A protein has these predicted regions:
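Short amphipathic, positively biased membrane-proximal segments
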Residues: 1-133
């Protein structure tokens, strides 16, 4: 009849929402200003295929960020969405590790591994803490 209010760790919620907001901001920059964003991340000048793939990734980040922020009032949904976000960050880190084998991609590859892994670590921390108190 009455649902018990689930306690939410405020720090974990804040971290999850910051990850969502950062993902939206970066995704928007990549989607709307693809070449300047890629240059800022030290990628070599992309061709049309690279620009298209970067825009796909930017769009993905916008949507995952929006889903994260939209789940701010629902602890169970926020936990599920941050898990998806974390898995995407791990996949990104793996893709960057593979790309870093190419000398032209070494700097953006290593940077991508570090940033993807850091985001996943923070996200998994939040995910674990959002699991209920």
């Amino acid at each position: 009849m009455f649902r018990r209010q689930q306690r939410v760790d405020p720090k974990a919620r804040k971290v999850a929402l910051q990850i969502g907001g950062s993902r939206m901001a970066l995704g928007t920059a990549i989607f709307l200003a693809t070449r300047p964003a890629l240059r800022a991340m030290r990628f070599p000048e992309p061709g049309p295929t690279g620009v298209t793939l970067a825009k796909l990734g930017g769009g993905r980040d916008i949507m995952i960020g929006a889903l994260t922020l939209s789940a701010r009032s629902n602890p169970e949904r926020l936990r599920t969405v941050i898990l998806v976000s974390n898995l995407c960050d791990l996949a990104d880190a793996a893709a960057f590790a593979y790309a870093a084998r190419d000398p032209q991609m070494r700097l953006p590859g290593v940077t991508g591994v570090l940033s993807g892994a850091a985001a996943a670590i923070a996200g998994f921390w939040a995910w674990r803490r959002l699991g209920g108190a």
